[in-house]
């Protein structure tokens, strides 16, 4: 039998509250034990009016706010010999030492500010940032700016076009090290490792992974954009990637390419003089 179906034995000293008598709309309230009500630093108003007596405070602190104890019924807690012996000043200390089982229901009290949310007028989607809304609005454009050179299908984003073109070229840069199966996207590889091989990724939540720079002509992958530029410049001089590369990077790479050539030329001249 799987361990998830096994029932653990509960410790005898833990008092569990029964939620069957409460309505559904009040089961998510925070449970504050009656015995700990008088230990609050700021007692409710009815406790102050009673002169700070422990009986008045305990009766009003059974539920949050002190006013719901009369409207909602509360399950009687079992009496233990420890509570009978702990009367007077030691009663609260004994109650604090007794473990209390609290509800595992998670709830939030915050509300979203509608002024911060940016809504799409066409489909009703909401976004936190204006730039995300602007990127989303591109999918509603009837005119597709980026066309596939193989089949003519249009896309509004260059990333979507690159992902589609790989289905024609067969380039799959993300390869599984276990079964050598390759994928066009990193997310597909991560999903394959988790579902098929049970390999969990070791990076933290929202942590940026090492980016791969892929040559769309032959499938070469490099750790930096400079490595990709050097590869395309040497093996694919007529590639469109060189035209789309920024002028600053192109000038930088040209300097790196010419410097070794100049050094080789100077060395050859010195050897000829000798």
Curated annotation (Swiss-Prot):
<dbReference type="Pfam" id="PF00096">
    <property type="entry name" value="zf-C2H2"/>
</dbReference>
<keyword id="KW-0479">Metal-binding</keyword>
<comment type="function">
    <text>Zinc-finger transcription repressor factor. Plays a critical role in maintaining the identity of epithelial lineages by suppressing epithelial-to mesenchymal transition (EMT) mainly through the repression of ZEB1, an EMT inducer. Positively regulates neuronal differentiation. Suppresses cell cycling and terminal differentiation of keratinocytes by directly repressing MYC and NOTCH1. Important for the correct development of primordial germ cells in embryos. Plays dual functions in thermogenesis and adipogenesis to maintain energy balance.</text>
</comment>
<dbReference type="GO" id="GO:0045892">
    <property type="term" value="P:negative regulation of DNA-templated transcription"/>
</dbReference>
<dbReference type="GO" id="GO:0007507">
    <property type="term" value="P:heart development"/>
</dbReference>
<dbReference type="GO" id="GO:0003700">
    <property type="term" value="F:DNA-binding transcription factor activity"/>
</dbReference>
<dbReference type="GO" id="GO:1990837">
    <property type="term" value="F:sequence-specific double-stranded DNA binding"/>
</dbReference>
<feature type="compositionally biased region" description="Low complexity">
    <location>
        <begin position="50"/>
        <end position="74"/>
    </location>
</feature>
<dbReference type="InterPro" id="IPR027756">
    <property type="entry name" value="Ovo-like"/>
</dbReference>
<dbReference type="GO" id="GO:0008285">
    <property type="term" value="P:negative regulation of cell population proliferation"/>
</dbReference>
<dbReference type="GO" id="GO:0008283">
    <property type="term" value="P:cell population proliferation"/>
</dbReference>
<dbReference type="GO" id="GO:0010629">
    <property type="term" value="P:negative regulation of gene expression"/>
</dbReference>
<dbReference type="GO" id="GO:0045893">
    <property type="term" value="P:positive regulation of DNA-templated transcription"/>
</dbReference>
<dbReference type="GO" id="GO:0060392">
    <property type="term" value="P:negative regulation of SMAD protein signal transduction"/>
</dbReference>
<keyword id="KW-0862">Zinc</keyword>
<dbReference type="GO" id="GO:0010719">
    <property type="term" value="P:negative regulation of epithelial to mesenchymal transition"/>
</dbReference>
<dbReference type="GO" id="GO:0003682">
    <property type="term" value="F:chromatin binding"/>
</dbReference>
<dbReference type="GO" id="GO:0045617">
    <property type="term" value="P:negative regulation of keratinocyte differentiation"/>
</dbReference>
<feature type="compositionally biased region" description="Basic and acidic residues">
    <location>
        <begin position="18"/>
        <end position="29"/>
    </location>
</feature>
<dbReference type="GO" id="GO:0001227">
    <property type="term" value="F:DNA-binding transcription repressor activity, RNA polymerase II-specific"/>
</dbReference>
<dbReference type="GO" id="GO:0045618">
    <property type="term" value="P:positive regulation of keratinocyte differentiation"/>
</dbReference>
<keyword id="KW-0597">Phosphoprotein</keyword>
<feature type="zinc finger region" description="C2H2-type 3">
    <location>
        <begin position="174"/>
        <end position="197"/>
    </location>
</feature>
<dbReference type="GO" id="GO:0051726">
    <property type="term" value="P:regulation of cell cycle"/>
</dbReference>
<dbReference type="GO" id="GO:0003677">
    <property type="term" value="F:DNA binding"/>
</dbReference>
<dbReference type="GO" id="GO:0060214">
    <property type="term" value="P:endocardium formation"/>
</dbReference>
<dbReference type="GO" id="GO:0060716">
    <property type="term" value="P:labyrinthine layer blood vessel development"/>
</dbReference>
<feature type="zinc finger region" description="C2H2-type 4">
    <location>
        <begin position="213"/>
        <end position="236"/>
    </location>
</feature>
<dbReference type="GO" id="GO:0001755">
    <property type="term" value="P:neural crest cell migration"/>
</dbReference>
<dbReference type="GO" id="GO:0009913">
    <property type="term" value="P:epidermal cell differentiation"/>
</dbReference>
<keyword id="KW-0217">Developmental protein</keyword>
<keyword id="KW-0677">Repeat</keyword>
<keyword id="KW-0804">Transcription</keyword>
<dbReference type="Pfam" id="PF13912">
    <property type="entry name" value="zf-C2H2_6"/>
</dbReference>
<dbReference type="GO" id="GO:0009953">
    <property type="term" value="P:dorsal/ventral pattern formation"/>
</dbReference>
<feature type="compositionally biased region" description="Basic residues">
    <location>
        <begin position="1"/>
        <end position="11"/>
    </location>
</feature>
<feature type="zinc finger region" description="C2H2-type 1">
    <location>
        <begin position="118"/>
        <end position="140"/>
    </location>
</feature>
<dbReference type="InterPro" id="IPR013087">
    <property type="entry name" value="Znf_C2H2_type"/>
</dbReference>
<dbReference type="Pfam" id="PF13894">
    <property type="entry name" value="zf-C2H2_4"/>
</dbReference>
<dbReference type="GO" id="GO:0048557">
    <property type="term" value="P:embryonic digestive tract morphogenesis"/>
</dbReference>
<dbReference type="GO" id="GO:0005634">
    <property type="term" value="C:nucleus"/>
</dbReference>
<dbReference type="GO" id="GO:0030512">
    <property type="term" value="P:negative regulation of transforming growth factor beta receptor signaling pathway"/>
</dbReference>
């Amino acid at each position: 039998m799987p361990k998830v179906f096994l029932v653990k034995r509960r410790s005898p000293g833990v008092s569990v509250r029964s939620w069957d008598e409460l309505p559904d709309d009040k089961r998510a309230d925070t449970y504050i034990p009656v015995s700990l009500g008088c230990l609050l630093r700021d007692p409710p108003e009815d406790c102050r009016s009673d002169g700070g007596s422990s009986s008045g405070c305990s009766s009003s602190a059974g539920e949050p706010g002190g006013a719901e104890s009369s409207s909602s019924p509360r399950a009687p807690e079992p009496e233990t010999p420890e509570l009978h012996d702990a009367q007077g000043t030691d009663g609260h200390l004994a109650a604090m030492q007794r473990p209390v089982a609290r509800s595992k229901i998670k709830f939030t009290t915050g509300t979203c500010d509608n002024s911060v949310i940016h809504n799409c007028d066409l489909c009703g989607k909401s976004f936190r940032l204006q730039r995300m809304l602007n990127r989303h609005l591109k999918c509603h454009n009837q005119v597709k700016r980026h066309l596939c050179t193989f089949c003519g299908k249009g896309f509004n984003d260059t990333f979507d076009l690159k992902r589609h073109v790989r289905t024609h070229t067969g380039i799959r840069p993300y390869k599984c090290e276990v079964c050598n199966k390759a994928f066009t996207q990193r997310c597909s590889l991560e999903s394959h490792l988790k579902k098929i091989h049970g390999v969990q990724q070791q990076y933290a939540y929202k942590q940026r992974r090492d980016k791969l720079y892929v040559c769309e002509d032959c499938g070469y992958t490099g750790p930096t954009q400079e490595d990709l530029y050097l590869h395309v410049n040497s093996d694919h001089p007529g590639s469109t990637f060189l035209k789309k590369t920024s002028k600053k990077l192109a000038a930088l790479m040209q300097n790196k390419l010419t410097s070794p050539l100049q050094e080789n030329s100077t060395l050859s001249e010195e050897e000829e003089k000798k």
